[in-house]
């Protein structure tokens, strides 16, 4: 139930991209959901590596824009939204790229890595880019995504007298029969963080996810508990010990990847 309409619209089959759910996301829809997840978590910066991004989600060159009208392409690429993200929401972006000079037109700063040494080449890059005025097709108006997602109570997480928790390294957590795959959350660095996420998932299920609170409110409540009581707030029979506190962004990542959770 993620609103990815800022980037994805008019999908085949009339899928509603303002409340999008799928079990087989493409590279572009997956990355769109990831960006929206970051926005929902309150991030102020996106770090994007071109090598691990969906090309059609990042940029459309002039020829592609001329051949296919915006109305014929379901994707509004990042390059068409990156200035809006910064100017309207104060969200910066750092992109590692080497495939397209189109990014020079929207970048504030251009840094070249030469033999592992960074050089600021903004002035030169902008001067050369000015010789190649960008062709800009019409882009849908910027509209802030809806973050009114309300996680519903989950019996798999709370319906057992004996809670079983298994932390599988830095890859996933299993709570009762609910598996949360965190392999793609690369910023997690140790199993203690996953233990913390498992405890937070249980805390959210038992005390916060009632179908009335939004996901943002649920995470706010979890962070408030940890701010006031530390990780002791998460200790309870059946829950893992040896915890490390994850960041707000990782809590959102965990809750969004728990396949058992349903939202309204």
Annotated model-derived regions:
Residues 26-39:
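Conserved alpha-helical scaffold flanking the Walker A/P-loop in AAA+ ATPase domains
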Residues 21-28, 68-75, 89, 93-97, ...:
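Hydrophobic alpha-helical scaffolding
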Residues 19-27, 77-80, 124-128, 140-144:
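Short C-terminal domain-edge/linker segments immediately following a structured domain
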Residues 84-90, 96-264:
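Conserved NTP phosphate-binding and transfer environment spanning the P-loop NTPase/kinase superfamily
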Residues 38-88, 96-127:
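Conserved P-loop NTPase nucleotide-binding/switch module
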Residues 1-25, 59-60:
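P-loop NTPase switch/communication element
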Residues 33, 77-80, 195:
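Short, contiguous clusters of charged residues that form electrostatic/catalytic patches at enzyme active sites
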């Amino acid at each position: 139930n993620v609103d990815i309409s800022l980037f994805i619209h008019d999908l085949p089959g009339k899928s509603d991209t303002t409340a999008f759910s799928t079990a087989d996301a493409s590279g572009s829809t997956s990355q769109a959901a990831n960006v929206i997840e970051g926005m929902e978590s309150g991030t102020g910066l996106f770090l994007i590596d071109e090598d691990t991004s969906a090309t059609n989600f990042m940029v459309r060159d002039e020829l592609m824009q001329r051949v296919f009208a915006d109305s014929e392409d379901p994707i509004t690429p990042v390059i068409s939204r990156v200035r809006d993200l910064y100017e309207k929401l104060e969200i910066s972006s750092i992109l590692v790229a080497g495939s397209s000079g189109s990014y020079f037109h929207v970048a504030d700063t251009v840094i070249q890595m030469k033999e592992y040494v960074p050089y600021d080449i903004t002035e030169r890059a902008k001067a050369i880019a000015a010789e190649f005025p960008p062709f800009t097709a019409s882009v849908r108006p910027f509209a802030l995504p809806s973050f009114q997602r309300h996680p519903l109570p989950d019996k798999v997480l709370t319906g057992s007298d004996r809670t079983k928790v298994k932390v599988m390294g830095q890859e996933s957590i299993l709570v009762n029969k609910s598996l949360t795959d965190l392999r793609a959350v690369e910023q997690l660095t140790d199993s203690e963080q996953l233990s913390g996420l498992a405890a937070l998932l249980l805390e959210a299920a038992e005390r916060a996810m009632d179908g009335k609170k939004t996901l943002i409110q649920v995470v706010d409540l979890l962070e408030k508990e940890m701010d006031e009581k530390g990780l002791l707030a998460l200790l309870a029979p059946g829950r893992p010990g040896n915890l490390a506190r994850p960041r707000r962004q990782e809590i959102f990542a965990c809750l969004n990847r728990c396949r058992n959770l349903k939202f309204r």
